[in-house]
Amino acid sequence: PMYQSSANLDLYAFQYKYDGRNRCIWKKLPGAGYVEMVYDNADRLVFSQDGNQRALSTGNWMYYKYDGLNRLTEQGTCTNKVTTSGTNVLVQHFYDSYAFRSQAGFNNSNFLDDASGNGKGALTASVATVLGSSNKIYTAYYYDIKGRVAKTVQSNLLGGYDVTATIYTFTDKPATVTHTHTTSGKPTRTEMYTYSYNHADRLLKVEHTLGGTKITLADYAYDNLGRLQSKSLHGSATNKLTYAYNVRSWLTGISGSKFTQNLYYNNGNGTAKYNGSISSMTWKAGCLLYTSPSPR
């Protein structure tokens, strides 16, 4: 709409250019500098440069490296788009095995060997450089026999580690997620989320345990059609939200002690809509009632 009153492509248009192989080699978003992209013979992005990088005296470029299976293995900055001279590695990725444990940052007891072979074909580790410093974040991923992430171990900037372990249900949904946080010179903290499901695999309850104390974060109830009927927060009836639907299962209302909302489609104050679009809505917080007809 703004372009119609002020025909300025740089401010109001999304612009793209392509090469002979139909690859996007240049793009410009409204109000931003243009981005250049360079590809290799396998059509993989190998260099890119945005307006901020172009403004630097060194003319930085982002570079990308891949393995034989076209998986990203390294990315960072360099000073030209012909060779990776002046390289500053920002992110590295490792796949298939845990041979990375011999490298600095991974060669300690917090990162375990895994001889199960479950990591074959999957991302097993990554190293990320903290911008503006020489610090790095080391992360390892461990998988179960079904290829699901069972454990993640990550170093943190406080001299410790964050370990996340997930146990799954038979249908591949998380049953428990345990997060252990360690910091140099301070006690270890452990928290656990527990998820309960009904016979149809719909989420029924989320519980949180910290310091041995378990609380209920949310309870969910469903109607006979599987639609969310109510949600109670922190096990309290006063923090309960109920949901209403029409015969087409379009959401028509949310009601609770602190917030109420009604949605209108082919009725209400707005122009009637019969395609599922909302024509108007009303919502109430406390004693104040607001009305908002749809702009369309």
Predicted regions and their residues:
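Conserved small/polar residues in nucleotide/adenosyl-binding loops
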Residues: 290-295
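Beta-turn initiation residues at beta-strand->coil junctions
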Residues: 1-6, 20, 26-32, 47-53, ...
